[in-house]
């Protein structure tokens, strides 16, 4: 009598469960690093654009003729925009 032929069990087609978690973690880490790098590049672009567009735009609002005055008080007393209709003997200085 011949012995029955045994067939080997079918191979599992499922991937190794430990390996799938490792691949998934690598994909998540790569996505986060890519997102952070993209945000940093965008911020760098916006900062360089801002610095380029606002280069040398510094405007002062000083009274005209202040460079020829003896002191700051003398320059401000002659400025018509700062002339007060009230009494000039009372002066208040805010520091």
UniProtKB/Swiss-Prot annotation:
Modified residues (Phosphoserine): 71, 78, 89
Organism of provenance: Rattus norvegicus (Rat)
Transmembrane portions of the chain: 26-46
Membrane topology: Single-pass type III membrane protein
Regions of this protein lying in the Cytoplasmic compartment: 47-95
GO CC annotation: cortical cytoskeleton; membrane; plasma membrane
Protein's name according to its UniProt entry: Glycophorin-C
Top-level taxon of origin: Eukaryota
Family label: Belongs to the glycophorin-C family.
Topology feature Extracellular, residues: 1-25
Keywords noted in UniProt: Cell membrane, Membrane, Phosphoprotein, Transmembrane, Transmembrane helix
Location(s) in or outside the cell: Cell membrane
Encoding gene, per UniProt annotation: Gypc
Primary localisation category: membrane
């Amino acid at each position: 009598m011949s012995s029955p032929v045994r067939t080997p069990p079918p191979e599992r087609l499922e991937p190794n469960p430990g390996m799938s978690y490792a691949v998934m973690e690598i994909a998540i880490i790569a996505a986060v690093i890519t997102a952070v790098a993209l945000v940093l590049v965008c911020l760098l672009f916006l900062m360089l654009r801002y610095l380029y567009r606002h280069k040398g735009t510094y405007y002062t609002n000083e009274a005209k003729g202040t460079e020829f005055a003896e002191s700051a008080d003398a320059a401000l007393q002659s400025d018509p925009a700062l002339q007060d209709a009230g009494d000039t003997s009372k002066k208040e200085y805010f520091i």
